[in-house]
């Protein structure tokens, strides 16, 4: 597989996770998933930035993305995309990638609170990598992602994450660019 194809296939595979991450930001707000509770260190468990509404819509749109991927793959693009999943497999993988990505964000927020980072404060690497690591962990219970794709995503995702955050900031969807 050449580099361009590897980048495209990797991006195509992880797209439900990227979508979930973006839609959680766009549709977030409301009740935080930690219910304003503190951990044993008396700091918030996660913070106000991770909400039930954002999580629901993130996962929902991640699954919708997976369904669209299935439809596109059945338009004759299977030879490009390297995946031959059924509709139900796309839905399961879309759910696992989406929920895994958002769980990774929650875990990252949990770690940031323990390390003394305030909500919205940048934590380089942690902000960019936890969502992709957990998306890959969650999906691996159903589908073992080829190592080439996993490694590509671990390298590609921080760049995509930073660029998408800058775009969201410029569009007024985020308060900070990171």
From Swiss-Prot:
EC nos: 2.7.7.67
Q: Its principal location?
A: membrane
Q: Name one Pfam family in it.
A: CarS-like
* Lipid metabolism in keyword set: yes
A Gene Ontology cellular component where this protein is annotated is: plasma membrane
Q: Which GO terms describe its biological process?
A: glycerophospholipid biosynthetic process
Location in the cell reads: Cell membrane
Which ranges does the record mark as transmembrane? 7-27, 56-76, 91-111, 125-145, 149-169
Which transformation does this protein catalyse, written as a reaction? Answer: 2,3-bis-O-(geranylgeranyl)-sn-glycerol 1-phosphate + CTP + H(+) = CDP-2,3-bis-O-(geranylgeranyl)-sn-glycerol + diphosphate
Family affiliation: Belongs to the CDP-archaeol synthase family.
- What's this protein's name? CDP-archaeol synthase
What species was this sequence derived from?
Answer: Methanococcus vannielii (strain ATCC 35089 / DSM 1224 / JCM 13029 / OCM 148 / SB)
Coding gene? carS
């Amino acid at each position: 597989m050449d580099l361009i194809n590897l980048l495209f296939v990797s991006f195509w595979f992880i797209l439900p996770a990227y979508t979930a991450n973006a839609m959680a930001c766009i549709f977030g707000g409301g009740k935080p998933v930690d219910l304003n509770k503190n951990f044993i260190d008396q700091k918030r468990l996660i913070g106000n930035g991770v909400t039930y509404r954002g999580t629901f819509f993130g996962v929902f749109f991640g699954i919708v993305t997976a369904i669209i991927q299935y439809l596109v793959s059945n338009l004759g693009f299977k030879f490009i995309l390297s995946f031959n999943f059924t509709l139900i497999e796309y839905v399961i993988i879309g759910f696992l990638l989406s929920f895994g990505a958002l769980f990774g964000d929650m875990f990252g927020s949990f770690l940031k609170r323990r390390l003394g980072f305030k909500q919205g404060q940048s934590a380089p690497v942690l902000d960019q990598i936890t969502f992709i690591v957990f998306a890959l962990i969650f999906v691996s219970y159903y589908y073992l992602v080829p190592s080439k794709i996993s490694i590509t995503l671990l390298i590609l995702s921080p760049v995509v994450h930073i660029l998408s955050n800058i775009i969201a900031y410029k569009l007024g969807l985020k308060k900070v660019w990171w």
